[in-house]
Structure formats: C-alpha cells, structure tokens
Regions:
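Helix C-cap/helix->beta junction micro-motif
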Residues: 54-59, 98, 140-141, 174, ...
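Short loop/edge segments at beta-strand edges and connector loops
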Residues: 39, 147, 180
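A short, flexible beta-alpha/helix-coil linker loop
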Residues: 10, 68-70, 110-113, 151-153, ...
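Short, flexible loop segments at the rims of nucleotide/cofactor-binding pockets, characterized by
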Residues: 10-12, 37-38, 81, 123, ...
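Structural motif corresponding to the early beta-alpha repeats
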Residues: 31, 35-128, 240-250, 286
Length: 290
C-alpha cells in the first residue's frame, strides 16, 4: 500500500522553489505526492522529477490549476471537445516529463460546470470518444488516465461509481482507471462498499479525507465499510489525502477560501498528514496484515 498527499496540503501552487516540500512529505512517511498542473503553474519538470526520484517518491498529477472553460471533453460544441483533448494531452506530456505514473481527476468534463438539464442523448458517447483518445495518447507515454466521480455540486456528468464504470465501458480502453473520493461521494453513494465493488475492476486510487475535507477519521465517512470492501476486492493502490491548507495565501486562509473551503480543517499541513497517516495505517494494519 502507498500513502500519499496532495501538494495543496502544503502550498497553493507548485514551483521550483517548492522542492523542499518533497523532502517534507518524504520525512512524514509519505510514498506519493500529487501535484496540480494548469496554465498558471510554471516549474521545471526535470528538477521535480530528479528530487522525487532521489527521495523515492512516486508522482501523480491532476488539473487543479487554471483550466480554460472551453477545453472540455463533454462540451456540446465539437470544437470545445477538440480543444479539451489537446489541453489534456499537454498535461499528459508534462506528466510524462515528470515520470508521473498517473494523470487523475474529473477529466471527463470541467469541474464546477454543472448543466442543470436533461442530458443530451449523445453526451456520454462523445465524452467517451475523447477519453478513449486521451487514454491512448497517455498509454504511449506510460501515464495512467484516472477518472474521479465528483459531487453533483461540482459536475452533472459522473457522480457515482456506476456512472463512472458506464463511461469507462463506453470509452473502451485499458488505460482508463478509477479513483474513489471519500469526500466527494459522501453526498452521492449510500453504500460505500457496493461502490467499491462496482469500481473494483478499474480502481487504482482512493482519495481519503473526511466529509468536511479534514484529516480522515472522526467524521461521517463510513471508514469501516470502506476499508472492509477495499480489503475484500484486493485493493493495493495509493491512499491519498487531499485538502487545502487553511493558513496560507496573501492573507492567512485566502487560499482555502479561494478553493471554496470556508472552515479551518487544515491549518498545519504536517500535522494533517501525521494525523491522517496514523488513522489510515491503523485501518490497513487491522485488515491487510491480520
């Protein structure tokens, strides 16, 4: 089992002068660092790749930075879908430069775009077509494409495990994988164990945070059911904590507010990781190694 954390637990934007954070993450006992990329994120991939390799840290990337709205694989307009494919391909190129093992997120659409309408008959089909092309492009570069269902407050396209598997089946490519996010799906799935079983053939990663996006443990997430089912299906992929540091920004807390997090659940990134790791390891130790 690998344990990871999103870089947003420590900083609002990855850059060359943030390399020391990889040392911090390694020192906390993490095996994986998830970086956010986008049009406003600028760094030297070779420097990040080298430091991660020196530390033995696995890298993954996701599109958490600036992502133009007209770049959307699910858009009604074919030109926007083509622009979306080209944009994601550039992020895959960056992932390959980093030797990152995955490009992950709600890549099927554009997070934050929620179309309150009856879905057009062809929406899943044309989205699947774009995902197939992206998965093929990434496979040549040894980068997994990992798709994440999100809350209906963030997307109208894929809110449940069943919907994600339907889309993956339509896209029909072996380089498409699934990510289960305990925070996003607390409003979408009544039975986490059933959702894990649904995703099992493609499940690669689990984002592990509480229902308030705080450190895992003590909230509403049904952790016992989640970990029982993960053990049942033989999951051995990354468990990754994801949150927004609530002490950083132009003024302390500005970053979290800018990401829509209005309560102080991650004032100290290192403490967040320590608390979360202790909980996650205890859940794994009581099942996988019993």
């Amino acid at each position: 089992m690998q344990y990871g954390a999103h870089i947003y637990i420590f900083t609002d934007r990855w850059a060359d002068d943030q390399l020391h954070l990889l040392d911090t993450m390694h020192g906390l006992g993490l095996d994986l660092a998830e970086l956010s990329v986008g049009d406003d994120v600028h760094f030297t991939p070779a420097k990040t790749r080298q430091r991660a390799q020196e530390l033995g840290l696995t890298l993954t990337v996701g599109p958490g930075g600036a992502w133009p709205l007209p770049c959307d694989l699910s858009a009604d307009d074919p030109a926007e879908r083509a622009a979306g494919l080209a944009w994601h391909q550039r992020q895959v190129d960056l992932a390959a430069e980093l030797s990152a093992v995955a490009y992950a997120g709600a890549l099927y659409g554009h997070p934050g775009v929620v179309k309150r309408r009856r879905p057009p008959a062809g929406e899943y089909a044309w989205t699947a077509e774009g995902l197939h092309a992206l998965a093929e492009y990434a496979a040549v570069r040894n980068v997994r494409i990992v798709l994440e269902p999100m809350s209906h407050f963030r997307t109208h396209l894929v809110n449940t495990a069943r919907q994600l598997m339907e889309l993956i089946d339509l896209a029909d490519h072996p380089n498409l994988w699934a990510l289960f996010d305990t925070y996003h799906l607390i409003t979408e799935e009544r039975d986490y164990a059933a959702a894990i079983r649904t995703l099992a053939p493609r499940l690669w990663c689990v984002h592990t945070c509480e229902n308030d996006r705080g450190a895992p443990g003590g909230g509403l997430v049904p952790w016992a059911s989640l970990f029982d089912s993960l053990c049942e299906v033989g999951f051995d992929g990354p468990l990754v904590m994801e949150a927004y540091n609530s002490s950083i920004g132009a003024a302390p807390g500005d970053f979290a507010y800018s990401r829509g997090m209005f309560h102080n659940v991650c004032p100290d990134g290192a403490e967040f990781v320590r608390t979360g790791l202790e909980f996650l390891r205890s859940q794994v130790a009581s099942r996988w190694h019993s």
